[in-house]
Amino acid sequence: MSGKELNKIVAAILFASLIAMMVGFIANILYKPVLEPKHRGYSIAVQEVSEAPTTQAQAPINIPELMKTANADNGREIAKKCLMCHSLDKDGPNKIGPHLWDVAGRPKASITDYKYSPALSALGGNWDDDSLFAFLHKPSSYAPGTKMSFAGISKPQDIADVILFLKTYVHDK
């Protein structure tokens, strides 16, 4: 290969590169891309829900009356969702939550081999009907900062049924 032929090949490569660059510059001039969007993503209209009390005052819940009409069999059905995280066996293992054997009347945060959240450990007192009712209704309101991620049981009669069911798992049995 002679020097002339080599020069022609190099010139052809340089000319092709120059043409490619010119096409790129012209394309950028003709088609200006939008680099920064005005808003990122999509806006979704969401209705705000406030936790403020409604204008209608709710009647206080009479827990002793609910306990009189409580049904342990119904409580057993409702409590099945508890068994994913809790055990009902006497001296049963702790799962995600502590075992619930003899929970009614027991001091709060009293299972020694379970690590309770500081929120629940600080409460003190025993698990009576009122405290169990409040905790089962909405654990995060009763003990803000609790590890229990359960949303709660909304129907008061269902809560009373679960409490009566839990009372069947006591030290006398």
From Swiss-Prot:
Membrane disposition: Single-pass type II membrane protein
Q: Show which residues sit on the Periplasmic side of the membrane.
A: 30-173
Question: Which SUPFAM superfamilies does the record associate with it?
Answer: Cytochrome c
Sequence positions that bind heme c: C82, C85, H86, M148
Q: Which UniProt keywords apply?
A: Cell membrane, Electron transport, Heme, Iron, Membrane, Metal-binding, Signal-anchor, Transmembrane, Transmembrane helix, Transport
Instruction: Quote the PTM field.
Output: Binds 1 heme c group covalently per subunit.
Instruction: Identify the Pfam families for this entry.
Output: Cytochrom_C
**Any idea what job this protein has?**
May be involved in electron transfer from bc1 complex to aa3.
Q: Which family does it belong to?
A: Belongs to the cytochrome c family.
List the protein's name: Cytochrome c homolog
- Species whose genome carries this gene: Rickettsia bellii (strain RML369-C)
What high-level taxonomic lineage is stated for the organism?
Bacteria, Pseudomonadati, Pseudomonadota, Alphaproteobacteria, Rickettsiales
